[in-house]
Amino acid sequence: MEKISPQNATLAELDALFESAMRVELDEYDESDLVLLQVCGAALGGARAKVCVVYQNELYLVKFALPNDDFSVILWEKTLLDLAHLAGIRVPESRLITLKNGQKALMIKRFDRINSARLPFLSARSWLNLQANSAQESSYTSFADSLCETSDKIELFCRMYFNALCANTDDHLKNHALLYDRTNKAWRLSPAYD
């Protein structure tokens, strides 16, 4: 398959993207499904099917429900984003949408873009220079020690506490990150995600 340049979808294209993503999940896809998903979600990692869309001139990630979900992971993630916000943790703007087929999808505003320009972004694992399956020590403590701003350290602690209270078992150093603040010329803790 030839290399395709990524592009952003629109809300009008979400139903077709959802159908392609489901065919891939169910191993019933053809090359056209792969091409469509590669164009709109090629660089987006993670376990959940997702694409990037433009909504009101802003970029959003859209996460789809998966056919084998035991419960509504999308609704649960939206609930946790809302609870984290109420707890004073910085999270990106998010909203649930309903596709034409009745399926729910979660839209999350991209915090690593300003007017579609990329902001420098590093996961905590990359920041600490850890390899994927490294036996090196990695922890909240080592990440917190590397943060310059006390407010970032406090927020990291609040996230740790929040994740423990919510029984978040997917809490690791790839789910925390830093964004480069060009105004203050410093790396700062990104909003919470995933």
Which residues are covered by each model-predicted region?
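Phosphate/dinucleotide-binding and metal-coordinating scaffold of catalytic cores
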Residues: 1-193
